[in-house]
């Protein structure tokens, strides 16, 4: 088994890290810069910064916040929310991000994936996908439908087919978030995660539902996902990144260690 990554997600609203359940009832938790620095020091493999109100407010991602976080973290750092065009991608990368995540924009304008991959390299382009189980039908053969605008708008697009098309267009990675399990802390949505991970060649990040290290172990034992994205379980102090990685190692799942050899 290849080394598996643990990624912490910082959903940011009004310059505060926030978290809700199934995209609703968000509460503010803390300062993104300080939290990002702490997770970086703790040995998390990557950070994801989502400016969750930027698209709805029709403004670019908070570039100044990206610059501040980039100065404090020494790990790969992806940003999303308010990425509206190639110029926004370029500015985010110049601000210190290694990757940019496109979600609603990519669904509405798929050509942005190919354009971004050509301009910056596919390793810089992450497809963020919000999916929800709606039942198997002729239109949605996998049973999982793509939603945009923070999970508010159903698109009538099958999640598995969209993942395969996005790979063809040039994404370097797919972050699959399950709306059904987001913030619930009862475990990841394994079915669609494994479907997509086995159907594409690019890395797949599972998002939505992690509540205990056992859920992460379960993810890697039962699917071909490359990384686990966590938020609530570390933001609220239930678990730490070193603790999560320690339990993964104990379960026989290889993890990346810090330069001093600690997990």
Which residues fall in each region the model found?
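Conserved anion-binding
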Residues: 12-14, 18-19, 97-176, 180-181
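Glycine-rich, proline-tolerant flexible connector loops at the mouths of alpha/beta enzymes
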Residues: 46-65, 104, 175-186
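C-terminal helical cap(s) of enzyme catalytic domains, especially alpha/beta-barrels
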Residues: 113-119, 217-259
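Glycine/small-residue-rich loop that forms an oxyanion/phosphate-binding "nest" at active or ligand-binding sites
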Residues: 53, 61-124
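Structural preference for beta-strand elements that scaffold enzyme active sites
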Residues: 5-9, 46, 74-78, 99-101, ...
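Charged helix-capping and loop-helix junction motifs
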Residues: 60-67, 110, 156-160, 186-195
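Conserved, mostly hydrophobic/aromatic
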Residues: 11, 39, 47, 79, ...
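Catalytic cores of alpha/beta
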Residues: 73, 77-99, 191-228
């Amino acid at each position: 088994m290849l080394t598996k990554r643990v990624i912490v997600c910082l959903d940011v609203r009004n310059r505060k890290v926030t978290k809700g359940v199934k995209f609703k009832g968000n509460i503010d938790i803390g300062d993104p810069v300080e939290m990002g620095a702490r997770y970086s020091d703790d040995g998390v493999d990557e950070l994801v910064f989502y400016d969750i109100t930027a698209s709805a407010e029709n403004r670019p991602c908070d570039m100044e916040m990206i610059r501040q976080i980039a100065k404090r973290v020494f790990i790969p750092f992806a940003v999303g929310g308010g990425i509206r065009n190639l110029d926004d991608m370029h500015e985010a990368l110049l601000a210190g991000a290694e990757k940019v995540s496109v979600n609603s924009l990519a669904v509405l304008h798929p050509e942005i994936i190919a354009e971004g991959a050509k301009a910056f390299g596919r390793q810089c382009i992450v497809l963020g996908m919000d999916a929800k189980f709606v039942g198997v039908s002729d239109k949605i053969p996998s049973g999982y439908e793509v939603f945009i605008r923070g999970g508010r708008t159903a698109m009538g697009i099958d999640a598995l087919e969209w993942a395969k098309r996005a790979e063809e267009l040039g994404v370097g990675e797919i972050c699959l978030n399950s709306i059904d399990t987001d913030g619930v802390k009862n475990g990841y949505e394994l079915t669609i995660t494994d479907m997509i991970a086995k159907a594409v060649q690019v890395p797949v990040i599972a998002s939505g539902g992690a509540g205990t290290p056992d859920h992460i172990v379960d993810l890697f034992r039962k699917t071909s996902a490359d990384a686990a994205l966590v938020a609530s379980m570390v933001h609220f102090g239930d678990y730490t990144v070193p603790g999560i990685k320690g339990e993964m190692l104990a379960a026989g799942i290889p993890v990346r260690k810090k330069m001093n050899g600690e997990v």
